Amino acid sequence: GLVAIVGTAYAIDKEFRKCAGCHKIEEGKKGGMGPNIWGVFGSPAGQVEGYRYSEYLKNSGIIWTRESLQAWLSDRKTRQEYFGKEVKDTKMMWTGIKKEEDMKMILDYLEKMK
């Protein structure tokens, strides 16, 4: 019911605040230190105008899917296992989403923002 919806919205907001220091998630808005991640699902990695990306990320051909985003938002070790060691050059200062339920919630949220 309503309590579950409000609880989920609060949990998403709490978890997303960690991202919001650098990223926006609003249609048509300019990003912050990091790109706006509205519509990130299905988009190519390292291609948002106005941001500097590593050569690796720009030329990777990575498309942001549930699987690739989960790897990217995980800890550094998981990110490097999935994408390769070159990904260590990313400017994104991120320690990763630790809890499985938080990861699912954030991915569900990002998937709807398009």
Region locations from a protein language model:
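Solvent-exposed loop/turn segments at secondary-structure junctions
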Residues: 28, 43-46, 99
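Axial heme c-ligation environment in periplasmic c-type cytochrome domains
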Residues: 33-35, 49-102
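Protein kinase-like catalytic domain
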Residues: 23-26, 73, 114
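Short microdomains enriched in Cys/His and/or Lys/Arg
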Residues: 40-52
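N-terminal export/targeting leaders of redox proteins
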Residues: 1-11, 111-114
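Sequence/structural segment immediately N-terminal to covalent heme-attachment motifs in c-type
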Residues: 7-32, 37-38
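Thiol-/selenol-based redox modules, centered on thioredoxin-like
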Residues: 102-112
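Hydrophobic aliphatic residues
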Residues: 41-44, 73, 110
